[in-house]
Curated annotation (Swiss-Prot):
This is N-acetylneuraminate lyase. PANTHER family: DIHYDRODIPICOLINATE SYNTHASE, N-ACETYLNEURAMINATE LYASE. Keywords: Carbohydrate metabolism, Cytoplasm, Lyase, Schiff base. It comes from the Eukaryota.
């Protein structure tokens, strides 16, 4: 992995492969890496996040997954970002130390979601305690208020953040509040921090206001198409970029109506990649055969601008 190369473009939020009986399946991660790189043209990953069921895994499982992704990604991936957030500060710190020890490109932390921070200082205090355990590793805040219930605006959080967290590098911004994102980018500018958008169906809007790239689950299987959208946006050919975004949105709108989450993402990924991702961990339950058939048919029916 290229050290300290700027993180931009697409980052696949990886799913966690599991065996039929619910254990993590490390044996397919080498195939997974090769698939992302060769088939999807995605060379950055975000491990043990929401899509990876990170908070449903044990600390030992999270360490094993981080190690395997680092091992299999060596020489193939540009960035391996390890999510180390947890409800327990001590566990989050342990995971941060481990990520640093194995050479992770960066660490990310989600806000605690049971006993929640209620203001900027409380949240910053938690983040600082975790970041300090990996003092040479780039640190990212993972903002996803729909899941955590922590709605502290990122614009507010970033004010003076480098004084508390010298390694602070940017934000995984998984919220639809584009005003908050825009104010962050306007005040901090792209050169200082990295802003990676996390709502796949709205990526083009985020790019328009200055996001550096994106972290998302669809880039596991629609990475190549989304990269073409990024290329069109950069030309700029906005009409072509919109076509890609609208078609991604058409697929997501379809599956969301059927019921779409991590379990269904694993099923779609299995179907498209041919790599067995296995079931989710309870309380999530596996996708139905009906869902899998309908989702596959819908995706195959889409006519992309590149003709593939």
């Amino acid at each position: 992995m290229t050290p300290r190369k700027k993180l931009e473009g697409l980052v696949a939020a990886t799913v966690t492969p599991m065996t039929p009986d619910g254990r993590i399946n490390l044996s397919v991660i080498h195939q997974y890496v090769d698939y992302l790189v060769s088939e999807q043209n995605v060379k950055n990953i975000f491990v043990n996040g929401t899509t990876g069921e990170g908070l449903s895994l044990s600390i030992q499982e999270r360490k094993q997954l981080a190690e395997e992704w680092m091992c299999q990604g060596k020489g193939k991936l540009d960035h391996v970002i390890i999510h180390v957030g947890a409800l327990s500060l001590l566990e989050s710190q342990e995971l941060a130390r481990h990520a640093a020890a194995i050479g992770a490109s960066g660490i990310a932390v989600i806000a605690p979601s049971f006993f929640k921070p209620t203001n900027k200082d409380e949240l910053l205090g938690f983040l600082q305690k975790v970041a300090s355990e990996a003092p040479t590793v780039p640190f990212y805040y993972y903002h996803i208020p729909a899941m955590t219930g922590v709605k502290i605006r990122v614009e507010e959080l970033l004010d003076g953040i480098r004084e508390q967290i010298p390694t602070f590098q940017g934000v995984k911004f998984s919220d639809t509040d584009l005003l908050d994102l825009a104010q962050c980018i306007n005040k901090k500018e792209r050169e200082q921090f990295v802003f990676l958008y996390g709502v796949d169906e709205q990526l083009l809007s985020a790019l328009a206001i200055g996001a550096n790239g994106a972290v998302g689950s669809t880039y596991n299987y629609l990475g190549r198409k989304t990269n073409l959208m990024l290329q069109a946006f950069a030309k700029p050919d906005l009409a072509l970029a919109r076509k890609y975004q609208f078609l991604t949105g058409e697929f997501l709108s379809f599956v969301i109506k059927l019921g779409f989450g991590v379990a269904q993402t694993k099923a779609v990924m299995t179907s498209i990649s041919g790599i067995p991702m296995g079931p989710p961990r309870l309380p999530l339950v596996g996708a139905s055969e009906e869902f899998i058939a309908k989702a596959k048919a819908k995706l195959e029916s889409i006519v992309w601008p590149d003709g593939d």
